[in-house]
Amino acid sequence: MVVHSLGSTNLQENQSAVGAIAAWRLQHAGYSRVTTLCRSNYDAVKTSGFRLSTSLWGKHIYKPDRVANDIREVKHTEFDYVVDATKNISATWTLSISEIRQVVRPRTTILSLQNGMQPERRFTKAFPANTVLAGICFLSCSQISPGCILQTSHIRPHAFYIGMSSSPSFRDAKQKLRRLVSLDSSFLAVRDIRIQQWIKLITNVTFNSATALMNAHTRDVLDSASGIELVRALAEECYELGLALGMAIPQGTVDSIIEDFLSAPPVVTSMLQDLRAGRPLELDALLGKLKTYLVIL
C-alpha cells in the first residue's frame, strides 16, 4: 500500500503535527510505504526525520520512506491513499486541489484529515469518481520547531476517527476504509462521520474560541468561573443548533466534552497556538459554518 503521507503507498499533504503523527502511525507497522510532502520543515525532516515526543507512544524518531518538497517530484507515483492534513483555511483550498490532482489516479482514495464540517466536500466535487474519506483528530499536538512534534494529551480513546464520505461504490469505500484503519489501533472506523464531525465542531467552537478569547489553556479557562460559564454557553448553543438541523447528537454530549477536558492535561488549542504565533486562524472552518447554518434556520 502506498500513501501520499499515508501507508500502502500513501502521500501526506503538508506535514503538520497532526499529519506527521498520522503518517507515522500508518507506516510504523511496516505494511505501507509513506511519502510526506513538507514545506518549511523540509530540510529538518529530510535530514533527521520527525522527532516525536508523545504522551501516548513515548519518544520516537520517525523517518518517512520518502520526503518531498514539491508534489511534482512524486507525480508519477501510484498512490493508494492521499491524505490532506493541512490547515482548513479557504486561501489554501484551490492550491490543495490543484496539487492533489497531480497524484490522484482512478483507484486513489483521498482522506481529508481536517477541522470543520464536511471539509472533504471540495474533494468529492473535484474527484467524483474517487473514494473520499473524512477523518477527525482528537489529539493535542504541535510542531514546536521544524520536524519536532510534541503531543501532550488526547480526549478520546482513539486518536483518529475516520468514516466514508463519498464513493462510486459503497462496497469499495467500505473495504478501503477497513484497510486503512487496520494499519494501527489509533484509527477507528465510524459509521456516521457527520455526527462525529458535529461533536468535534462543538469541541472546537467551544474550546478554541474560549482559549483564544481568554489567551489561556483549557485548564485555566475551566478553573475560572467566567470561563466555565462561557464554555458551557458555547457548547450548549452549538449542540442545540445541531439538533435543530436534524443531527442525532447523543444526549449528554456537552457534559461529556467538558468532563473530557477537565480530566485531561491542559490543552493549548490549535487556535490559541496560531494566535500566539501570529498565524492565520481557522475561522471559516471552526466558526463560518455555524453562521451559514444560522442563516439557513
UniProtKB/Swiss-Prot annotation:
Pfam short name (any one): ApbA
Gene name tied to this protein: AFT12-1
Full protein name: Oxidoreductase AFT12-1
Enzyme class, broadest EC rank: oxidoreductase
Active site residues of this protein: 200
UniProt-recorded Gene Ontology molecular function terms: oxidoreductase activity
UniProt entry tagged with the keyword Oxidoreductase: yes
Coiled-coil annotated residue ranges, if any: none
Family: Belongs to the ketopantoate reductase family.
Gene3D superfamilies in the record: N-(1-d-carboxylethyl)-l-norvaline Dehydrogenase, domain 2, NAD(P)-binding Rossmann-like Domain
Binding site for NADP(+): 14-19, 115, 282
Superkingdom per UniProt: Eukaryota
Miscellaneous: Gene clusters encoding host-selective toxins (HSTs) are localized on conditionally dispensable chromosomes (CDCs), also called supernumerary chromosomes, where they are present in multiple copies. The CDCs are not essential for saprophytic growth but controls host-selective pathogenicity.
Annotated function: Oxidoreductase; part of the gene clusters that mediate the biosynthesis of the host-selective toxins (HSTs) AF-toxins responsible for Alternaria black spot of strawberry disease by the strawberry pathotype. AF-toxin I and III are valine derivatives of 2,3-dyhydroxy-isovaleric acid and 2-hydroxy-isovaleric acid respectively, while AF II is an isoleucine derivative of 2-hydroxy-valeric acid. These derivatives are bound to a 9,10-epoxy-8-hydroxy-9-methyl-decatrienoic acid (EDA) moiety.
Biochemical pathway: Mycotoxin biosynthesis
Binding site for substrate: 115, 204, 208, 270
Entry EC number(s): 1.-.-.-
Assigned keywords, A-Z: NADP, Oxidoreductase, Virulence
Presence of keyword NADP: yes
One GO CC term on file: cytoplasm
